[in-house]
Amino acid sequence: MLIMKKLLLIAATSATMLSSSVSFAEGMDHEWYLRIDTGAAMFNEEKDKATGVKLKSNTTVPVALGIGYYISENFRADLTLGTIIGGKLKKSGAATNAPFTRTNISASHKPTITRLLINGYVDLTNFDMFDVFAGAGVGSALVKEKITYNGITGLSSNTKNRTNISYKLTLGTSAQIADGVKVELAYSWIDDGRTKSKNVIYQGTSVPTGGMHYQSHNLTAGIRFDI
């Protein structure tokens, strides 16, 4: 219930900001649009707090849906709701932190991330066939993770949702393929913040777990439909 209230508050704030942008352009003949994006993403490497093992990312699939508005010929803004599918930070190796030093383990951190962002984009160049644009976004992310260990018994755990400020920087290109339909190819860097830290008692010792910082490099394809 608390999570739903937070998301509703974030949505209301973002919608107000988007409405303000629309009001600024009131009286001009511009259009709303819907968008959908997906692609591939990799998280930055992170160190597992409990064991000291440096974790690497697999390839995850980001997905986002949104609604936006063309404020001017070269500027637009949108509100997007996104998540990830199948992302993990994992690694097998020898632990370096006590009390697990030199123990061969396998660590896995599987995050659940839901982000709501308000984004702004500006076209940097306009060619006959395509445009090049840059953008930035800010909003909120709900982040939690499932932590599992092989080789150590009783240390696996789950963290609860944490609400973080999320940031996004984008550089991409777009092209019109039909009347009112544009496609995009873009690179984005996204910072969703850290998960909650949690201490687990292992054989009488308090061991810190969680606290992963989820930053990702994203390559996505998207499509925009004017409405």
UniProtKB/Swiss-Prot annotation:
It comes from the Bacteria. InterPro entries: OMP/PagP_b-brl, OMP_b-brl. Residues 1-25 form the signal peptide. The keyword Chloroplast does not apply. Keywords: Signal. The keyword Calcium does not apply. SUPFAM superfamilies: OMPA-like (SSF56925). Transmembrane segments: none annotated. Gene3D superfamilies: 2.40.160.20. To R.conorii RC1281. This is Uncharacterized protein RC1282. The lineage of its organism: Bacteria, Pseudomonadati, Pseudomonadota, Alphaproteobacteria, Rickettsiales.
